[in-house]
Amino acid sequence: MASCFMPAEFAEIMEPLLPPDLPVGPRGGRPRTPNLVALQVIWYVLTTGIRWQDVLPSMGCSGRTAHRRLRKWQEAGLWGMLHLTLLDLLHRDGKLDLNIAVVDSTLVPAPGGGDNTGPNPTDRGKTGTKHTLLVDGNGVPLAIRTTGANASDQKQLESIMQEFPRVKGKPGRPKEHPDAAFADRGYDSESNRLFLRWLGIEPFIAKRGTEHDSGLGCIRWVVERTNAWLKGLRRMRVRWDRLEVIQDAWNKLAMSVICFRLWCECPV
């Protein structure tokens, strides 16, 4: 597993997006925990998967405080801005292939239930969540959607493709859609193909009832690798947070961590 401690380079990218640390008021009182210290704890929880209440006092920030910052920054759109910033850096350095998009999903247990959960048909109906992931041709994560584990893959394709980000980093107008989209048999439907063609995207979706030798797996494998990278962030293996806003924050931060490691060529 890669380091559970936040690199200084990540803090440098994140710091301009953070709100300024508030000074102690005129009446005194306890100093507010610095944002970068809270960010270090959030990174640690994401990578190790520990519970908020198990955060050590020696880290300089309680788990409760870090949880509040995680939610507050998600509501302010900060995690989304971080993800876009890292995508821009990858695009600037020629590490994105936005001509191709690949879609796949993975199921995550959610023992405590919560928003966007449902019975997992592959796990005896236990409560779970489905993460639908969109990546570029190199496997860089572009978007994640969270639904109940029993949600149909067919119905997720339109929504996830509409979340294709407008990445800057190079001269010219940002690309609005990829040229081609790849998906497995779970997304096979004529309506999905018509929708993609309407957007100007060439669909490459494996058809149900056909042999597994279409050759599409030579391209689709990148999304399966990215799903494995996300599961390497232990907080993403099991969903413990019931609120949608917290899960969305984890999704965007996890994508940002993967993007950062690809950009700086760190172990993923």
Residue spans for each PLM region:
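Short alpha-helical elements
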Residues: 1-268
